Amino acid sequence: MQRRHFVAGLAAAGTLLATPAFADLPSLRFRDMYSRGKDLSEEAIALQGQRIVMTGYMAPPLKPEINFFVLTKTPMATCPFCDDATDWPNDIVLSYFEGDMKFTRFSNLIRVEGTFDTGIETDGPTGFVSKVRLLDTRYTIL
């Protein structure tokens, strides 16, 4: 084996190892989440309980000690806070994480992996009402 082929093979292997593990998961785009108004699409309903990937932006956290962030379709300098499910925007997803997570700048495009969950729920400590969520979330900056 020639040295340059060996080095090229090492570089290719490193690229494969650096590829996120969630590359093979189903993805859901914000525009495909709802069919009409505030009704979830068939695609979104079919993904209930599955690990999925979404791409968007992390809105600034409500408080530094919370265990979730809001994934948004477009960058937002302030966090959208909803106190009623009827006000739930169709371009945000509440994203819960376990343990500590480093928040990123609101203008960084991120790819998020989590278990897709639907239904109206209220976060006890904050009172934040959500219609869709990602559970056990992790992200990478794109």
Predicted regions and their residues:
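OB-fold and OB-like single-stranded nucleic-acid-recognition modules
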Residues: 22-142
